[in-house]
């Protein structure tokens, strides 16, 4: 039984899942929206929301925390340029997931996750 086991495993090991989340977060910050599977979009959404909440206040500590999650200085700089101005007065709800329908090859449910 999976009682009290939070989060989705996505059929990957811990390291692979962590790298997947990091890459999805970097791509989302750089491109403002990405097309991925619905399961991946739902899994990475809370991570991105927490990262943007950290980036709302531009302090050295917040930058270090964001860099530890992103591991990309360019993405971190970009996040800290738009997050305080865009999301300064908003408490959560920074992303939107839109369903796109099944993928042609394998029928996986696709989704568009974007920064609002």
Curated annotation (Swiss-Prot):
NCBIfam families assigned: L17
Quaternary state and interactors: Part of the 50S ribosomal subunit. Contacts protein L32.
Protein name: Large ribosomal subunit protein bL17
GO terms under cellular component: cytosolic large ribosomal subunit
Molecular function as annotated in GO: structural constituent of ribosome
Similarity-based family: Belongs to the bacterial ribosomal protein bL17 family.
Organism name: Chloroflexus aurantiacus (strain ATCC 29366 / DSM 635 / J-10-fl)
UniProt keyword annotations, A-Z: Ribonucleoprotein, Ribosomal protein
Classification via PANTHER family: LARGE RIBOSOMAL SUBUNIT PROTEIN BL17M, RIBOSOMAL PROTEIN L17
BP GO terms, sorted: translation
Signal peptide residues on this chain, from the entry's feature table: none
